Amino acid sequence: MLLLGSLRRTLSKIESLARGISWADAVRITAAKPNGCAETNLSVRMLNRQVTIRPGTSDLRCIDKVFVEQEYWVPFETTPRLIVDAGANIGLATLYFASKFPGAEIIAIEPEPSNYDLLVRNCSGLTNVTPWRAAVWNTNIPLKIANPDAEKFAFSVTPEPNATSAIEALTIPQILDKSGYSTIDILKLDIEGAERELFSNGCEEWLPRVRMIIMELHDRYTTACSRTVYSKLCQFPFRQEVRGENVFILFDSEQ
């Protein structure tokens, strides 16, 4: 009975993964012994291209989140010109947005070196995607990875004035200035608790220049994260939808 139960769970996992990647890859990646180091390529159905992930890491969970559960499916009608993917990880959400909104320019921002390397490779050949190695913050201050031993999708940053190899901090106004756009149509935030810092100071300056926010809130990592964010959001009229771990905020066009 134990063997039968294990087989059923394995088949269920394969069937679920095959909604987002090829059947062959779903079988192979489920049967593989994870080592956390080697890379493998998966054929993603909706992209008609392969992506590189690291078996044994959180990358496969991200494949499930983005391409199986489609947690970044946008519930509001929009034709974005500029999408900013802050906390882009290895580029899976970036690729999802590029597929759904081929006319949009996408800036993908990721601070952690190994994730950034895969982000660049996974998005290679896409002329509308520009990767930046940086972190989003509320001011210009040197940053470092606060938890280098964390899972690949859970790296967070913290100020470190004396860091020898600091990560560049970018504010939202700086991103807009560098992009050449006056507004961000979709701002995706998956920044592992840094959303509290981002909204705690100066966000009143840039929130009127953002049309939609897609974010994952991280109260499990950062105290009063949601309270800080919503205390600022509530100064502006908006509609909200929730899909999986993501909150979708659509601002009133007249704000």
Please give the residue ranges for each predicted region:
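Phosphate/nucleotide-binding beta-alpha loop and adjacent structural elements of enzyme active sites
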Residues: 1-255
